[in-house]
Amino acid sequence: MERDKLMTGLHNLVSVVGDRVATLQGFAELLRSTGSYRWVGLYDVDHAARIVKNIVWSGSGAPEYPTFPITMGLTGAAISSRETVNVGEVAADPRYLTAFGTTSSEIIVPVFDGTGENVVGTIDVESEKPNAFSEDVQSLLEACSNVIRPLWRR
């Protein structure tokens, strides 16, 4: 993945004061094209309602689960552990919620609130390739999470 291209593009998107949804849509599209991934989605985490809700997505189709309980799937694991969940072969992980039959690997990166304590959103990236998300890619996605964090301030 082209780290410099992604980070420069992301900083440019976030620096423009504008619509949150449009900015996140731009990020999803930038990330998907830069990394050659099959699908990227960004989600809000509503702790009061105990749900996760899709904000935007980029890829070959709408999310199979646009809204789901906060405890479900790989996303639920990332929220409860407050850590990135990186699964190299989703078929072998019982937490995986099948959305696209061609997904082989998936990474869920939490987005934290301003205090760094609460998960307020997630970045969900899926690939048709097994083990698509190296430690370097995971580190880059976690850096992206920090850059987009202000978009969750309400």
Regions found by a protein language model. Name each.
Residues 45-48, 55-99:
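Regulatory sensory and allosteric helical modules in signal-transduction proteins
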Residues 48-51, 114-118:
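Short, solvent-exposed loop/turn segments that connect beta-strands within catalytic domains
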Residues 86, 110, 124:
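Conserved beta-strand segments that form the floor/walls of ligand-binding pockets within enzyme
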Residues 105-114:
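A short, aliphatic-rich beta-strand micro-motif
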